[in-house]
Design a protein with these regions (language model features):
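Glycine- and acidic
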Residues: 68, 181-187, 228-232, 256-261
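A glycine-rich, aromatic-flanked flexible loop/lid motif
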Residues: 172-173, 212-223, 238-250
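Short, surface-exposed helix-loop/turn micro-motifs enriched in polar/charged residues
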Residues: 191-195, 214-215, 260-263
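Flexible secondary-structure boundary motifs
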Residues: 198-236
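Charged/polar positions within long, soluble alpha-helices
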Residues: 211, 250-258, 280-291
Length: 331
């Protein structure tokens, strides 16, 4: 809770700033009779702060982000980026569907109330009403779910560090950040077509070090290889789903549209689930790569992915174990 003394001091500082803005406006020729007096400036600032605090009290939760010392405008921007990425990580861990309505308070949302009218062949008008609620969102026991995913939460959460405390990131770390953002953008995108393309982009950013011809089968193969290695393909359907997903993505990029609502619904579900599973597996896969090869670049990532296709994951696990011993301060 914000202390009253802090609020009073903030009102005093912001009032002085507003009065100064009024003086500068008058100096530049703005009519004085149309500006605020000092008392009006004070009332304006108080009212603005009061309404904002009241709105905050109604929020189910509030994010508090501390950014390392830097320019105020940049630090504010980074705080927003960090909060958005934190929400994206929650979306990855809990799934796209139950977290679709989780958003920042000022983010754009759909209409809360809508209506639909249509007439049948007999001229009878049928009406329907729709009301959306932003609460509750996610799952009831979301905290417990996140705690159970402790390893993935730690690794994916590490993507927040270079945002609030600018440090040099590894190549794989930047790829993970990009993929998380692609996934989050896909979840919140109201357009099904662009959402599917973004889900695929998240996977491509994770598993491809370079562009190659014939990517459709290569894409499906890499998704299958990684998910199979982490026991996430028990029904042996990942390859077929990934193949169909990439074909759908290519068709959409070239202007094709879905013919039915069911078709788009099925495609978006496959895209979100495959992208989510790839991110969760990559949290562990990337950790192994970093332990084995320190900071693999594009070429090394491509080499590793091809070797996983040929030999599976055991060799990388062994290399990661050796890397941990090699770089350990205790020998």
């Amino acid at each position: 809770m914000i202390k009253k003394s802090v609020l009073k001091h903030s009102i005093h500082v912001n009032t002085k700033a507003h009065i100064q803005c009024v003086k500068e406006a008058i100096a530049q020729g703005f009519p004085q009779e149309r500006t605020h007096t000092k008392d009006e400036s004070r009332q304006l600032v108080r009212k603005l702060q009061s309404r904002a605090v009241k709105a905050y009290k109604d929020y189910p939760w509030i994010a508090c982000v501390k950014v390392s010392e830097c320019d105020e405008a940049i630090s504010k921007e980074r705080a927003i980026q960090a909060t958005e990425m934190a929400l994206h990580i929650i979306r990855i861990l809990l799934g796209a569907k139950p977290t679709r309505e989780i958003r920042l308070a000022w983010s754009r949302s759909g209409a809360l109330r809508s209506a639909h009218l249509h007439a049948d062949v007999h001229g009878v008008i049928h009406a329907s009403l729709c009301a959306d609620s932003l609460e509750p969102v996610g799952v009831i026991n979301w905290h417990e779910v996140l705690i159970r995913a402790n390893l993935e939460l730690d690794i994916l959460g590490s993507a927040l560090i270079p945002i609030v405390n600018p440090v040099e990131t590894t190549h794989l770390h930047q790829r993970l950040i990009d993929a998380i953002n692609w996934f989050g953008d896909a979840v919140t995108d109201s357009n099904v077509h662009s959402s599917i393309v973004k889900y695929v982009s998240a996977i491509e950013r994770l598993f491809f070090g370079k562009f190659e011809a014939g990517r459709t089968k290569l894409f499906a193969g890499r998704v299958r290889d990684v998910l199979k290695a982490f026991n996430c393909d028990e029904e042996h359907r990942v390859y077929t789903k990934a193949l169909e997903l990439y074909k759908t993505r290519s068709a959409l990029v070239h202007g094709e549209q879905f013919r039915t609502e069911d078709e788009s619904f099925n495609s978006i579900n496959i895209a979100s689930e495959l992208s989510r599973m790839c991110l969760l597996c990559s949290a562990q896969l990337y950790s192994m790569m970093l332990q084995a090869f320190e900071n693999p670049n594009n070429a090394k990532l491509e080499e590793i992915m091809k070797r996983i296709n040929d030999e599976g994951l055991n060799w990388l696990a062994e290399a990661a174990a050796l890397g941990c011993v090699k770089h350990s301060p205790i020998r």
